[in-house]
């Protein structure tokens, strides 16, 4: 897209946004016409790598993630706690967390850290990175001095999927991976497709609605912030969990 002569801007836009830009007389050159197909093609080589992957272009499906966590927890119960339920999503799926520490079932006087992932449903790599980090901690505990120190001197909490409904929706429309739905699945009168929902990352209380640049009041926009702060059960669950702990750091 050209802003002024000699200046070009690369943007990721929806079909509706493309139509809007064209209606304003803005010149567009489409570099990647189908992001879903692009990501599926780009991710395919990873299938040959020598570590356990999921069936959705290497990413775990919702069911696979739950199964894989149960397997890891059963193998390493000495440092991985059982899951705790923080709340339910719009479509009544569990939002859950677990702790990695040397005494995972005890509340020790150690600094707490929170890791979260998949606030945006189309960003599965965030969940996969967390999951493999946990797997690394478990497998190297007692062998790697730095990782062992972390486990022994921190209480590390993980919420692998904040937005389960959006993630399952992407799985339903693109079972081979590459689904581009971003928001949760609240009915915002925008149809049943990817325009539906609230952007959970814009629904938290801090700075909510400060402007219409970083978030949108339009229910069909990808950055729709909701009718007010913390309207969504997913953000409420994260808020309440954080208020019940004293996290020193949060990696969101």
Predicted features along the sequence, with ranges:
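M14 metallocarboxypeptidase catalytic domain recognition
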Residues: 1-252
């Amino acid at each position: 897209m050209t802003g002024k002569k000699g200046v070009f801007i690369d943007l990721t836009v929806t079909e509706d946004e493309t139509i809007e830009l064209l209606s304003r007389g803005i010149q567009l050159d489409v570099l990647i016409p189908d992001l879903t197909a692009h990501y599926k093609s780009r991710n395919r080589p990873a299938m040959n790598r020598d570590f356990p992957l999921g069936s959705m272009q290497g990413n775990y499906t919702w069911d696979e993630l739950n199964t894989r966590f149960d397997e890891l927890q059963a193998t390493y119960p000495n440092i991985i706690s059982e899951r705790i339920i923080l709340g339910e999503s719009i479509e009544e799926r569990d939002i859950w967390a677990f702790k990695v520490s040397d005494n995972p079932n005890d509340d020790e006087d150690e600094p707490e850290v929170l890791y979260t992932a998949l606030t945006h449903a189309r960003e599965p790599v965030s969940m996969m990175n967390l999951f493999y980090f946990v797997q690394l901690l478990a497998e190297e505990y007692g062998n790697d001095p730095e990782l062992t120190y972390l486990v022994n001197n921190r209480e590390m909490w993980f919420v692998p999927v904040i937005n389960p409904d959006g993630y399952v929706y992407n799985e339903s429309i693109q079972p081979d991976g590459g689904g581009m739905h971003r928001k949760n699945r609240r009915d915002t009168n925008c149809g049943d497709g990817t325009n539906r929902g609230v952007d959970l990352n814009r629904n938290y209380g801090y700075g909510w609605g400060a402007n219409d640049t970083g978030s949108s009041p339009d229910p069909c926009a990808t950055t729709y912030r909701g009718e007010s702060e913390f309207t969504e059960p997913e953000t409420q669950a994260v808020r309440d969990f954080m208020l019940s702990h004293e996290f020193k750091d949060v990696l969101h």
